[in-house]
Amino acid sequence: MAPTALLSVSDKSGLLPLAKTLHERYGYQLLSSGGTAKVLQEAGLPVTPVADHTGAPEILGGRVKTLHPRIHGGILARRGDPAHEADLQAQQITPIDVVVVNLYPFRETVSDPAVSWERAIENIDIGGPTMVRSAAKNHDHVAVLTDPDQYDRFLQDLAASGGAVSAAVRRRLALDAFAHTAAYDAAITRWMQNRPELQPADDGSASSLPWLEALPLRQRLRYGENPHQGAAWYSAPKAGWGGAIQLQGKELSTNNLLDLEAALATVREFGYGEGGSHPAQRPAAVVVKHTNPCGVAVADGHAAALTRALDGDRVSAFGGIVAVNGRVDAPAARELTSLFLECVVAPEYAPEAREILASKGNLRLLELPPTAIDAAGHDHVRSILGGLLVQDLDDQPVAADGWTVASERAPSQAERDDLCFAWQLVRHVRSNAIVVARNGQSLGIGAGQMNRVGSARIALEASGDGARGAVLASDGFFPFDDTVRLAAQHGITAVIHPGGSKRDQDSIKACNELGLAMLLTGQRHFLH
């Protein structure tokens, strides 16, 4: 009996070469449904429509095509099993040896933020995953292909084994198939969980669902944070960094991606690009080292913002990661070539900027559209031993109208503007975090110290004489008055912090004694 291949695909890429080779070189009978059968017939290949094979027409507008015992019996039957062979013969079922199925494009469909509930639901495949799982379960006898990228290697394996499909190949394909259907179901679950119609009820009923995310492999990385650690990058194809285009430069590393994420989060405080949900309000640039910003600035143009950000700490900026929140033009590109950098990310680059940056061949240049950011979701996920921690991103807009003046002296408008700028930055610095800023530029940043006054000392010393007349922001409350007193010694004129310490009055009293203004935000921004 000639072998049989069942082909039913949404993505027709590579379909004809695969079908022709199976039929013409290896003698496969071709069984197909719907649009796939039409493509094969138009190419002159002999194909049996599924409806003719089963004796049952497609019904419910195509919702039911392949859900039939003649299909699944042919896929699931164990060859050589007397009972199975008897059932096949009694029901006149033809064994199916190769199943080629890819699924309705659900993930691509829901990548459109405006997609309707009805259109999304109609792009949930039912028959396809059922056939894929049946074939994967019976991989001792059936090969299953779920992606056009598998076709060439499958045909190479067939040629190498004289037309037979080895057990090793079938097992590998079965693993791929189960991963494929798991990812598909996870995408459906995540989309439904994020729909406003299905947000958790007040009783918490929806929150007990498992947290699911199945992401395809984007690329294997050379190593992790250190050379002895293996690493890989998994990403949704068009969401977040999965939507980035690398325009030039060396391969991205684990540390590059971590630093890029930190730089992007920081620069988005000032808006990003055009056409997204949060367009740029003012040109801004950020320089990051080891996931901490070391220089941040706003200005009237991106070249000026870059100069000011780099001037914030040029020593630390060497070998850094830069994010720009708008189109990089030629002057900005020239500023970017003024010192060694690892990566730059921006929503767009002017052609003349690309020409200038091409002189730095190893510089990794990434273009990330605002639409990719909008498609990335709102979860912040970190791994712990044996599990995941999932929280909302800390990206709510600054709400300055809710701040209170705790000191006798209210900040001037210039001080208030600087305090707002510093407060936007401090939540992107590892705790304990202190930022010193003035005129839309960071002057000193203290990060990751085990006590707050230690971070303050680092930030103030880095600021040097620039601290005089500047402001200071803290991601957490002042547990004692030592930070305020140290700030005053360096010439700081105003401070901002969440408040909430049992000793708030000590710091407020110190501000009044020393002439500093203090704002309380009522919101903490720890970052671990």
Swiss-Prot record:
What superkingdom does the record give? Answer: Bacteria
The record's GO molecular-function terms, alphabetically, read: IMP cyclohydrolase activity; phosphoribosylaminoimidazolecarboxamide formyltransferase activity
Gene Ontology terms: biological process? 'de novo' IMP biosynthetic process
Q: CDD domains per the record?
A: IMPCH
Pathway, according to UniProt? Purine metabolism; IMP biosynthesis via de novo pathway; 5-formamido-1-(5-phospho-D-ribosyl)imidazole-4-carboxamide from 5-amino-1-(5-phospho-D-ribosyl)imidazole-4-carboxamide (10-formyl THF route): step 1/1; Purine metabolism; IMP biosynthesis via de novo pathway; IMP from 5-formamido-1-(5-phospho-D-ribosyl)imidazole-4-carboxamide: step 1/1
Q: Which reaction does it catalyse?
A: (6R)-10-formyltetrahydrofolate + 5-amino-1-(5-phospho-beta-D-ribosyl)imidazole-4-carboxamide = 5-formamido-1-(5-phospho-D-ribosyl)imidazole-4-carboxamide + (6S)-5,6,7,8-tetrahydrofolate; IMP + H2O = 5-formamido-1-(5-phospho-D-ribosyl)imidazole-4-carboxamide
Q: Entry's SUPFAM superfamilies?
A: Cytidine deaminase-like, Methylglyoxal synthase-like
Keywords for this entry? Hydrolase, Multifunctional enzyme, Purine biosynthesis, Transferase
| Residues annotated as domain MGS-like | 1-146
Provide the protein name.
Bifunctional purine biosynthesis protein PurH
- Could you tell me which species this protein originates from? Synechococcus sp. (strain WH7803)
